[in-house]
Amino acid sequence: MKNKLAPYLLLAPQILLAILFVAGLIAGITQSFGVIPAFGLTEPTLRYYREIFLRPDLKESVLFSLKTAGLSALLATAGGVFFCGLCVMGGKTRGLSMRVIELPIIVPHAVTALFLISLLSKNGIAARILYSFGWIENQQQFPALIYDQNGAGIILGYLWKELPFMIYFVISLMANINRSLGEAAVNLGAAPWTAFFKITLPLCRNTILSGFLIIFVFALGAYELPMLLGATKPRALPVLAYQQYLHPDLRNRPYAMALNGIIIVISLLSAALYYALMNGQMRRLKLSGEKRRTSGRRGRSEKKGEGGGADG
């Protein structure tokens, strides 16, 4: 009896978290349509979405969020894969150095923001060092990396956090593939880097794309770094939603949920695109496998025919 219950007991925490997540999601979507009985709002309406889409700063905020999330995910993915390749080809995929590289993963985003402010602001450590060496005439000449309208500080913050995550996410699979198939290709005469780019890297593609999607969706919906490192204008979508959520008039709560609804839709579209890409790749692999099997059967039948003709 205990053995039968063990799997369900192990799944219980995950099921509980899933229920809480789904309940919160449903509540948020319901509130975005203006249904909050506690505040006297009982009639479903699209008014809040219409007013959100009529806001002059919405387009700017959407583009800013997509830019910071997309660049952060792209740079973290490219840098993580490049570093994984160097480690795998150098045979250094474990040990203390890897543990040190992965340390930023456990650092909260708020702490990351404070670290970057103390390091990269015009009154920060980097500006003081450059000024002390005489490379800048005063600290105000230091480049505006924090609170700038291009989101450079936000991107740097996500890059510092998510690049180690990408390394952690990919390196184990990449090392296992290279150790088995990559080394087999090298033994058959392929150059090490040729085997890596032709065999190891393509087989890691799905995992790399999954990591990119995770980073992109997270950076799109998180508000800590855009709130602490971003400029007053433009504001990222999560920051706009947070400001509406803290509005003194509680009847403004549906505006915050409508902004969150826009973030959810963008995330779902990204996931749908990823799913379509994966399905297309699987179909191509299936078709190529069927073609190889068909050509193999034809080759065997032709050989049998030649053998039969020779016997005749």
Q: Where are the regions a protein language model picked out?
A:
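Short membrane-interfacial helix/loop motifs at transmembrane-helix boundaries
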Residues: 21-56, 230-232, 285
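Membrane-interfacial helix termini and adjacent extracytoplasmic/periplasmic loops
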Residues: 46, 113-159, 193, 229-233
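Membrane-cytosol interface at the C-terminal ends of specific transmembrane alpha-helices
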Residues: 138-186
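Non-cytoplasmic
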Residues: 24-34, 166-169, 207-240
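Transmembrane-helix boundary motif in ABC transporter permease subunits
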Residues: 1-2, 27, 71-102, 114-118, ...
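Transmembrane alpha-helices
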Residues: 11-22, 103, 107, 160-170, ...
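Interhelical loop and adjacent transmembrane-helix boundary motif
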Residues: 2-4, 49-57, 227-276
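C-terminal transmembrane helix and the adjacent membrane-cytosol boundary/short C-terminal tail
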Residues: 34, 171-182, 254-302, 307-311
